[in-house]
Regions:
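Extracellular, beta-strand-rich glycan-interacting domains
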Residues: 305-307
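Formylglycine-dependent sulfatase
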Residues: 1-294, 300, 309-337, 343-359
């Protein structure tokens, strides 16, 4: 529903990936950032690095911690799970590395092309290059300690980039996340293999359990996409569902996405076409975009992704799309009922604390 440093928490009945892996004989470890719980030990980690790289977790400053970990665990009898959390592509971008030339940056179709946007993107791309360099060093460390061949390396993100119409929205730039998987010693993951099928974040946990031969509990909502990785299937999900309720503010959104269409419900009225996170608002780009998006937001949105991949033309009132809109809306409400979505009972209570906990 919302951020853990603003009053929200995972239900105690929920088991995490580290908990499941411990049951399979893995040791579990965390270095760097997490924001699933106030107390990271409740997530099932055996060890948690105390080293912090302020003001946010910087991959380069944590590099020594990674190297020490691999050195200690290179000859372990038990397999290990290590979560490495970094925030270098989180705002503010400028503190993480050298910006690229603003003249050569690629402008996403959902942003205007001007000096403010180009300068901001140049810092963002610089931060990405910094993380890319750091990941290269981590992979080199795995090789140096003879761990690379038998280690499944996963690089992923929790949401889209921190830009208006991306982060904190259910448009594709906010929903699409990075997922890279590499396992040189396995014949399951082929090098340079790309997949275009839709998957959801909740599918990663059952896939990892499936990869190690563990039984997937019936109460796990995600689906293993191991058959995709093995090339045994070309199809996976026909649709995915997404939601947002709180970030720094209450902004309840729900959506269903298929390969061809997307249907979004905005449960709260807004004078802005879409809301902007505080981290974006505080930068020059955000202040500019607040004026750029002054337009009343519709209650419902429907997009033909084949003909309008940038989600600019809302077809909710187009009679030619009335049938598909109703079909997607019915499916979305069915999913909301299945997941006991509290929005069905009205406005969700705000649990934000007056003094947010920092961790």
């Amino acid at each position: 529903m919302g951020l853990v440093d603003r009053g929200w928490a995972l239900p105690e009945r929920n088991k995490t990936l580290p908990m499941y892996l411990k049951e399979q004989g893995y040791t579990t470890h965390l270095i760097g950032f997490q924001h699933e719980a106030i107390n990271a030990y409740t997530l099932g980690y055996d060890t948690i690095s105390k080293r912090r790289a302020e003001p946010l977790h910087n991959c380069h400053k944590l590099n020594r911690s990674y190297q020490k970990f691999f050195e200690i665990h290179q000859n372990d009898e038990k397999p290990f799970y290590l979560c490495m959390g970094v925030s270098q592509v989180h705002r503010p971008f400028g503190i993480w590395g050298d910006p690229v030339d603003p003249k050569i940056v690629l402008i996403p179709p959902y942003l205007p092309d001007n000096k403010i946007v180009r300068e901001d993107l140049s810092q963002f791309y610089g931060a990405i290059q910094g993380v890319d360099t750091c990941i290269g060093k981590i992979i080199k460390q795995l090789e140096d300690f003879s761990l690379r061949e038998n280690t499944l390396f996963i690089y992923t993100t929790d949401h889209g980039e921190a830009y208006p119409r991306a982060k904190c929205t259910l448009y594709d730039p906010g929903l699409k996340t990075l997922l890279l998987m590499s396992w040189p010693g396995s014949d399951i993951l082929q090098q340079n293999k790309k997949f275009n099928q839709m998957i959801s974040n909740i599918d990663l946990l059952p896939t990892l359990l499936d990869l190690i031969g563990a039984k997937i509990p019936k109460n796990v909502e995600g689906k293993s996409f191991l058959t995709l990785l093995k090339g045994e299937s070309d199809t996976f999900r026909k649709e995915i569902y997404s939601e947002k309720s709180f970030h720094e503010y209450y902004d309840p959104l729900r959506c269903i996405r298929t390969d061809e269409f997307k249907f979004i419900i905005n449960f709260e009225k807004s004078e802005n076409l879409y809301q902007i996170g505080m981290d974006i608002q505080q930068d020059a780009l955000g202040k500019f975009m607040l004026d750029y998006i002054k337009k009343t937001r519709p209650n419902e949105e429907l997009y033909d992704l084949d003909n309008d991949p940038n989600e600019k033309d809302n077809l909710i009132d187009d009679p030619n799309y009335k049938e598909i809109g109703k079909e997607l809306k019915d499916k979305l409400y069915k999913w909301m009922k299945l997941t006991a979505d509290p929005i069905l009972k009205g406005k969700i209570k705000d649990l934000r604390q007056e003094s947010p906990i920092r961790f």
